[in-house]
Regions:
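Short hydrophobic helices that act as membrane-entry/anchoring signals
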Residues: 1-16, 23, 27, 134-157
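Metalloprotease/metallohydrolase-associated module, dominated by Zn2+-dependent proteases
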Residues: 36-38, 46-180
């Protein structure tokens, strides 16, 4: 199982390297001691920075939220250029469309934090003494990162990223039809 996990991290190496960069940046900003910064290692932390446990809510939130948000935003940006051309329009002739499609999948497959970071998030934000309003506000984010961190342990985030890339142009065109109409007029 570890070999499959490492293979998917290598296949999505651009997103893997960028996620380790974001995690390393958060460790540097928050002063979290880092044990191993290698992006590619043959264990369950492949694609993650191995660091000490976070000490407070701010560190934990940043460790889970910043890499997730940055990779998700980049994934959406690249999928707008790649998946829209390939999946929605059906333009199979452009090399940039395929490149953007691959980069979008790579970033989407590497959004979620490690399972240990998610459990740390749960310990800090869902303990008995935590604010109820904060628990409610963070519930959707926690559900997403918890569910996808479990999928990541079994290398299923790659499959989920492909499904997201295929569905993304249709969902986007449904939510923002004006943007799609303008882009079709300009094409």
């Amino acid at each position: 199982m570890i070999n499959l996990y490492v293979a998917t991290r290598v296949l999505t190496s651009v997103g893997t390297v960028l996620r380790t960069f974001w995690e390393q940046l958060v460790c540097r900003i928050c002063g979290i001691p880092v044990e191993d910064v290698r992006a590619f290692k043959v264990d369950e932390l492949c694609g993650h920075v191995e660091h000490e446990l976070t000490e407070n809510k701010k560190q934990t939130f940043l460790m889970c939220f910043l890499p997730f948000t940055m990779n998700f935003i980049l994934s959406v940006c690249f999928l707008l250029g790649g998946a829209y051309k390939i999946v929605y329009i059906g333009d199979f002739k452009t090399l940039t469309g395929y490149l953007f499609f691959f980069l979008g999948i790579s970033f989407a497959a590497n959004c979620v934090p490690s399972f240990e970071d998610v459990l740390s998030f749960k310990d800090f934000f869902y303990s008995k003494d935590s604010n109820v309003v904060l628990k409610i506000l963070l519930a959707p984010f926690f559900a997403v990162i918890y569910g996808f961190s479990i999928l990541e342990r079994y290398s299923l985030t790659f499959v989920a990223a492909i499904a997201f890339a295929i569905a993304f142009p249709y969902v986007f065109s449904y939510l923002f039809p004006v943007i799609i109409s303008i882009s079709q007029l300009l094409a």
